C-alpha cells in the first residue's frame, strides 16, 4: 500500500469554456484536495476522491466570479463542494462519479501518470497525475445562457479542464 500526501502548492485545476462563439474564457479553482489510496504499482487498486471548493473559482474578473458563484451557475451558498469519486483507474483512463450542484453523473476522463521522482529539496519521493476531460455543464443543472443577435449563444455547453496533482509518496 502506498501512502499519498497531496501537495496543493504544486497542483492546479484549470478550465476553459467557449465565449460569444468566438473565444475562450479560462479560469481555475484555487481550493481543491485529492485523496488517493492504493498501490502505485497496480493502477487497478487506486481509489481517489477529489473535492473542489466552487467558491474558490478564479477567472481574474471579480464580477464574473461572483456571477459564477450565484445560482445561475454553481450556487455556492447551497452547494459548497464538487466531488469526483473514482470507480476504476487504468494507466490511461479514470471512471468515476462527478457531483456538481447535487447532481451526479458517471464520467470518463483521460489520465496521465508521470512516474516517480525524487524531490532534490527534501529527498521525498513524488508522483504526478494529470487528468483531462470535457464536461457538459448542462448535465449538472448549469444552464445559464443568452442568445446572441448574430446567432448562437453566449456560452458553450462543454467545459474542458486539466487537473494536475502532485503527491509525496511513501510505502
Curated annotation (Swiss-Prot):
Segments crossing the lipid bilayer: none
InterPro entries to which the protein is assigned, alphabetical: Lipid/polyisoprenoid-bd_YceI (IPR007372), TTHA0802/YceI-like_sf (IPR036761)
Stored Pfam families: YceI
Gene Ontology cellular-component terms listed: extracellular space
Coiled-coil regions listed: none
SMART domains in alphabetical order: YceI
PANTHER family: PROTEIN YCEI
Similarity remark: Belongs to the UPF0312 family.
Official protein name in the record: UPF0312 protein SAOUHSC_03022
Source organism (scientific name): Staphylococcus aureus (strain NCTC 8325 / PS 47)
Amino acid at each position: 500500500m502506498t501512502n499519498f500526501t497531496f501537495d496543493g502548492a504544486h497542483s492546479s485545476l484549470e478550465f476553459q469554456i467557449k465565449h460569444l462563439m468566438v473565444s475562450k474564457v479560462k479560469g481555475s479553482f484555487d481550493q481543491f484536495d485529492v485523496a488517493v489510496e492504493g498501490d502505485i504499482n497496480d493502477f487497478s487498486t487506486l481509489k481517489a476522491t477529489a473535492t473542489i471548493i466552487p467558491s474558490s473559482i478564479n477567472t481574474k474578473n471579480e464580477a464574473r466570479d461572483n456571477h459564477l458563484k450565484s445560482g445561475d451557475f454553481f450556487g455556492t451558498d447551497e452547494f459548497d463542494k464538487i466531488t469526483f469519486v473514482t470507480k476504476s483507474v487504468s494507466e490511461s483512463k479514470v471512471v468515476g462519479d462527478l457531483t456538481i450542484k447535487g447532481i451526479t453523473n458517471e464520467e470518463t476522463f483521460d489520465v496521465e501518470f508521470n512516474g516517480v521522482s525524487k524531490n532534490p529539496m527534501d529527498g521525498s519521493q513524488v508522483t504526478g497525475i494529470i487528468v483531462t476531460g470535457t464536461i457538459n455543464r448542462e448535465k449538472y443543472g448549469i444552464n445559464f445562457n443568452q442568445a446572441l443577435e448574430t446567432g448562437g449563444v453566449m456560452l458553450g455547453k462543454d467545459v474542458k479542464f486539466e487537473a494536475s496533482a502532485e503527491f509525496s509518496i511513501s510505502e
